[in-house]
Amino acid sequence: MNKIPLIVIVGPTAVGKTALSIEIAKAVNGEIISGDAIQVYRGMDIGSAKITQEEMEGIPHHLIDILNPDEAYSAAQFKVHAEKLIEDIYSRGKTPMIVGGTGLYIQSVLYEYEFVEEDQALKKELMDHYESLDKETLYRLLTEKDTKAASQIHINNRQRVLRALTYYEMHHKSITDQKKSHTLSSKYDTYIIGLNMPRPTLYDRINRRVLLMVEQGLVQEVETLISKGYRQSQSMTAIGYKEMIPYIDGEVSLNQAIENLQQNSRNFAKRQLTWFNNQMTIEWFDTSELTIESIVEQIAANIPRDDNDEFS
């Protein structure tokens, strides 16, 4: 039985994944599954650089605006949703595509992650105990028990703090050392495309994108989310949102908030590139040297297909 062909487009923030993905989808009769951890949330549009209906140009997109900002979402949930969508898209004669920058989400689909089974009764007992504690106490406990995890988790990201504490108590080791077993080969016929450009060019694009976000109403978007009661939600710790809260609270100037967002976005892009290079076999394209048309042409010649595929 032939494997289902799957096109994956990855790359750092602001590199141009959206525009290229639309052109590829047109060329291969594709539908796009968003591989972004924040674009699943309704009302978090500007800060996540969510694609607009106009930008979609009629290409169907999935896993965008499916949750409220106070609802949790994980790689395990993404895996279930994405696998169902891939089969559905393919069954309708279309080419499934995953586009995004949340590496663990995408990897969970490609490499058959099996999320570790745990003692659910013990886990619930621990979670119930920790749920009664305030965030300062929770974070202090995590710092005492698992310094490495605490250094990588924001104090306001209550769900991740809870998960790290619970994992440590259950397994007596840091959640940062957790290994999720996966097979070395994918059940899909996968073509992974990576977009990149020289670091100075990418950083300049990031800086300009942040300024555009502010012009488009990022501060007002964050204020609206706060007014709806989402201030303490895990989603609000995402880059693009957490930097605006101190400005709204009167703790920093708008210029400082913008600089913080630009710096955090640049750091995130660097981490994304490192992660993708270490975790996946990718064919990279420099978007600063190649036109979208030339990239699409090269990609179309290498797209996985079965004997029944007909690409327009």
UniProtKB/Swiss-Prot annotation:
Region listing for Interaction with substrate tRNA, in residue ranges: 159-163
Enzyme Commission numbers on file: 2.5.1.75
Domain of life from the UniProt record: Bacteria
GO biological process, one term: tRNA modification
Site feature: Interaction with substrate tRNA: T102
GO MF annotation, one: ATP binding
Key words, A-Z: ATP-binding, Magnesium, Nucleotide-binding, Transferase, tRNA processing
Cofactor: Mg(2+)
Disulfide bonds: none
Catalytically driven reaction(s): adenosine(37) in tRNA + dimethylallyl diphosphate = N(6)-dimethylallyladenosine(37) in tRNA + diphosphate
Binding, ATP: G11, P12, T13, A14, V15, G16, K17, T18
Annotated residues for binding of substrate: T13, A14, V15, G16, K17, T18
Enzyme's top EC category: transferase
Known partners and oligomeric status: Monomer.
PANTHER family: TRNA DIMETHYLALLYLTRANSFERASE
Protein role: Catalyzes the transfer of a dimethylallyl group onto the adenine at position 37 in tRNAs that read codons beginning with uridine, leading to the formation of N6-(dimethylallyl)adenosine (i(6)A).
Family note: Belongs to the IPP transferase family.
Official protein name in the record: tRNA dimethylallyltransferase
Originating organism: Macrococcus caseolyticus (strain JCSC5402)
